[in-house]
């Protein structure tokens, strides 16, 4: 069975940012080129995986993840009559000096009754992975409480982030959020510090860790965070 070229259709069907779309595009063009003169078989998939072994482990995992999502799309849309999946590369254990595995925290204290601006800021960072610069650009109208999503625009790219109910029930009654969003970075820093000893960077990292644990690919996570590259996220996928 030949591999049909449905790359454009696949990308159109996904709500990717321009950068994420570009990453998927090049991964899939690489896949398509390999199968140009080959049939899709389990043996051919093993050959493809072997070819990827020349790349870094992180690059191998990204290309395999992209290929597997594409195969699923083709199968679900009846473009191929058999579902194929490439087995992910085994993540080799590295020395402790090279590995990076911070502990995931739940922060139950963040989800008590809303008591101060610092708590609201902590929730924004933990729930959406926002930094102070992004919080300063927020408007209360960006929160759609009916359909539970937050719209953020950065560098001309819109991100639509889901709002969890445990966040909504604690903050949607706020009346003066725009006043907080208009404050200086120093003000936001001070208010957060009044509420918790954790820095905005530490809380944002917890958002990243929870998304990795939930199974988000490195490209999907970069899209959620509005990042133009995946470089800063690679350490979480080693």
Swiss-Prot record:
GO terms for molecular function: DNA binding; tyrosine-based site-specific recombinase activity. PROSITE patterns: CB, TYR_RECOMBINASE. One of its GO terms (biological process) is DNA transposition. Residues 90-238 form the Tyr recombinase domain. Signal peptide: none annotated. It is found in: Cytoplasm. It comes from the Bacteria. SUPFAM superfamilies: DNA breaking-rejoining enzymes. Keywords: Cytoplasm, DNA integration, DNA recombination, DNA-binding. The active site is at 154, 204, 236 (o-(3'-phospho-dna)-tyrosine intermediate). One of its GO terms (cellular component) is cytoplasm. NCBIfam families: PRK02436.1. Belongs to the 'phage' integrase family. XerD-like subfamily. Putative tyrosine recombinase. Not involved in the cutting and rejoining of the recombining DNA molecules on dif(SL) site. This is Tyrosine recombinase XerD-like. It comes from Lactococcus lactis subsp. cremoris (strain MG1363).
């Amino acid at each position: 069975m030949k591999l049909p070229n449905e790359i454009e259709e696949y990308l159109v069907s996904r709500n990717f940012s321009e950068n994420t779309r570009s990453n998927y595009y090049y991964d899939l063009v690489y896949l398509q080129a390999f199968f140009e003169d080959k049939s899709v078989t389990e043996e051919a998939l093993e050959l493809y995986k072997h070819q990827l072994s020349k790349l870094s482990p992180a690059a191998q995992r990204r290309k395999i993840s992209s290929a597997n999502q594409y195969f699923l799309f083709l199968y679900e849309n009846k473009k191929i009559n058999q579902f194929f999946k490439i087995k992910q590369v085994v993540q080799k254990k590295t020395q402790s000096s090279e590995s990076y595995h911070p502990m995931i925290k739940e922060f139950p204290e963040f989800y008590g009754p809303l008591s101060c601006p610092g708590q609201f800021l902590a929730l924004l960072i933990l729930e959406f992975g926002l930094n102070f610069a992004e919080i300063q650009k927020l408007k209360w109208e960006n929160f759609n409480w009916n359909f539970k999503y937050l719209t953020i625009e950065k560098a001309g790219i819109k991100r639509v982030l889901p709002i969890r109910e445990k966040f909504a029930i604690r903050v949607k009654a706020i009346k003066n959020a725009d006043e907080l969003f208009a404050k200086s970075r120093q003000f936001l820093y001070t208010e957060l510090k009044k509420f918790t000893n954790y820095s905005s960077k530490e809380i944002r990292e917890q958002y990243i860790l929870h998304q990795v644990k939930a199974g988000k690919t490195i490209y999907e996570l970069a899209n959620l965070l509005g990042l133009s590259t995946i470089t800063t996220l690679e350490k979480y996928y080693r």
